[in-house]
């Protein structure tokens, strides 16, 4: 019983810390990190989180984090809710954007980094907290259950910063930008 109480204590401590701002993008508020046991609503989760949750008011444009092809649209009310899955096949990775009010793209469509692909919302298992769930998969994984970390990886190390139309991004690896617009001048120094 002691290990369970100790683990619950850690979860409650983490929950009390609240949201964090992304160091490289002061506009981006991370509500729940990869593998976190605290949800976007700051309550304990039953399973580790398979992505990152970013605060976004309902109706905020969600941007493609990298060039890709829409591999599927998701409608999974017990998990992702309305979502978009982008394939980045040159890197054998997929990015998943969940809890949208609606998508602006269709399967098979080519998208460019920074292109609006949908609007943020509270669909699916969002705990009624408006946010965007960003997930990176090594296999198409949008329909898996959150907490199943197989085939997922932490998106944060792949983030190159805020989207800037005039910036060149690495082409030898998957470099993502935040899926939410940053204020002008808020772009980061992490290149």
Description of each model-found segment:
Residues 96-98, 129-136:
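Histidine-centered catalytic micro-motifs
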Residues 63, 73, 90-114, 140:
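Short histidine-centered loop motifs in beta-beta connectors
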Residues 19-82, 91, 113, 122, ...:
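Surface-exposed, glycine-biased beta-strand/turn segments
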Residues 1-6:
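Positively charged n-region of N-terminal signal peptides that target proteins for export
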Residues 7-16:
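Bacterial N-terminal signal peptides
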Residues 98-99, 137-165:
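Short peripheral tails and domain-boundary helices/loops at the edges of structured domains
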Residues 120-133, 141-145:
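Active-site loop architecture of trypsin-fold serine endopeptidases
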């Amino acid at each position: 019983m002691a290990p369970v109480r100790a683990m619950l204590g850690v979860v409650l401590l983490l929950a009390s810390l609240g949201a964090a701002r992304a160091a490289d993008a002061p506009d981006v508020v991370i509500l729940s990190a990869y593998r976190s046991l605290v949800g976007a609503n700051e309550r304990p989760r039953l399973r580790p989180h398979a992505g990152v949750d970013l605060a976004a008011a309902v109706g905020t444009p969600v941007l493609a984090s990298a060039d890709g092809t829409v591999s599927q649209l998701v409608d999974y009310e017990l998990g992702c809710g309305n979502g978009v899955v982008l394939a980045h096949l040159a890197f054998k990775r997929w990015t998943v954007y969940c809890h949208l009010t609606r998508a602006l793209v269709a399967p098979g469509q080519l998208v460019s980094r920074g292109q609006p692909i949908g609007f943020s919302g509270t669909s699916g298992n969002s705990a009624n907290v408006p946010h965007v769930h960003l997930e990176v998969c090594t296999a198409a994984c949008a329909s898996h259950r959150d907490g199943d970390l197989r085939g997922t990886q932490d998106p944060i190390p792949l983030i190159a910063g805020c989207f800037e139309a005039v910036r060149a991004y690495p082409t030898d690896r998957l470099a993502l930008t935040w899926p939410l617009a940053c204020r002008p001048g808020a772009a980061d120094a992490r290149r």
